[in-house]
Amino acid sequence: MALGKKRIVTQKPNLRQRRDVDNGGLGLGLEFVQYKRGFGRKRILISSGDEMEDSIFTSPVGKKLCDDKTTSVAEGQSRELEDLPLDILVRIICGVEHEDLKQLFHVSKTIREATMIAKQSHFAYSTPRKTSVFHHGRFGWDKPFDVEDDDEEIEAPGAPLQKRYRLSRINRNKDDSGVSVALFH
């Protein structure tokens, strides 16, 4: 298929009803629709009827219920992330910035384990900060070392220059008097 084209996959109505109810489904009449754009693809569930009124998806969002049968979409997405193998999860967490590790530590046990491994392996060596330490202080934009506003900048002290000794191309132990006589006469 060419880029930007859509492909919709649907089932016949009688097969759809049999599969939803007979295979232990909820009988919601959901069908699989697949959109292709560019190099990625999206999978979307769309209702084919008015059965959504009694569905768990239209229940009002309130307090979290501890029931495993009613899970929200956000929990389902986090569960998919937690179901990944630990090494892949560690690689994902290595892409997170250093300041966000504390928030990831409190998400779940599996993400906490992956965060600990990523912190020991990846973040122990590369811990860059978004802003420079000297430009951003605790209480706003401060100057380093409490410098007053004299419009004087602190210059870095010059490092002492190393003495460089040039090795002579002429060997001093040799007698080169014959060469100099031939050149200057």
UniProtKB/Swiss-Prot annotation:
Q: Which GO terms describe its biological process?
A: cellular response to hypoxia; response to 1-aminocyclopropane-1-carboxylic acid; response to abscisic acid; response to bacterium; response to jasmonic acid; response to osmotic stress; response to salicylic acid; response to salt stress
What PROSITE patterns does this protein map onto? FBOX
Instruction: Tell me the InterPro entries matching this sequence.
Output: F-box_dom, FBS1-like
State the superkingdom.
Eukaryota
| F-box domain residues | 78-126
Protein name (record): F-box protein At1g61340
Species this chain originates from: Arabidopsis thaliana
The taxonomy runs: Eukaryota, Viridiplantae, Streptophyta, Embryophyta, Tracheophyta
